[in-house]
Amino acid sequence: MTEKTDLDEVVEIQTAVTNIKDEESFGEIIKTILFALGIALVLRIFVFQPFNIPSESMRPGLLVGDYLFVSKWDYGYSRASIPFEPPIIKNRIFSQPLRRGDVVVFKHPRDTKTDYIKRVIGLPGDRIQVIGGQVVINGVPVPRIALSPSMITDNFGNTMSTNRWQETLPNGKTYMVYDFYEAAPKDNTDVYVVPAGNYFMMGDNRDNSTDSRFDPVLENGVGFVPEANIVGKARIVLLSWDERAKLHKPWTWFTALRYNRLAHSIN
């Protein structure tokens, strides 16, 4: 049996110290990762949530390929605004009412896995109707100004003309809407009476939006949106890419970037 020399003992000690340092370094890395994930989760729950625009229902204000930040604090918090929808909140906490004209993200009333983004048109107790394409709130037509028609190109490359209107809600909120067709299916509706604790939502692209005008059962629409389903308020377009952007073609991340929409505030 070979006896250990002083040098062997020194080497063993150094090796043990190195292993301890490696374990400590690995532990610090894990702690840093967990801390970063915790901060990200807290921010997503209480501050901002990212969201992307999948359809053209909110044109002209929001485009397919827009990536938004949705603020969580404006209306308080509910199951819908927390990841995985834990059943710890029955309705909302720190609740604040939505305002007419706000652009909000919400969970579909019949499919809480699906997020929608629309504009708030009707508040609880309101009577909403559409007559000849013009919104009527509590018997009063929403003032609108005809703008010059616009030639637009959709995501399939089709170019067409659309009428544009500038609407002004009773609280003074002004925004632009598209109206493609003179007699679209929901250009004339019955009166909708918004129940307590619910809101009436519409897309700005009026003839290409499945919203509160459509019955959730009979027409596969949205219907009234309960306040518990509100996720947050759309605040800012952080980034935006057009249809040329491809994940597997990194150069298109720059050539397809809509530079004029970077950090673009949402009206």
Pin down the residues of each PLM region.
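Acidic/histidine-enriched ion/cofactor-binding microenvironments in catalytic or ligand-binding pockets
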Residues: 56
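Hydrophobic membrane-insertion alpha-helices, especially the h-region
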Residues: 31-48
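Soluble "head" domains of membrane/secretory-pathway proteins
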Residues: 2-27, 46-47, 51-52, 60-267
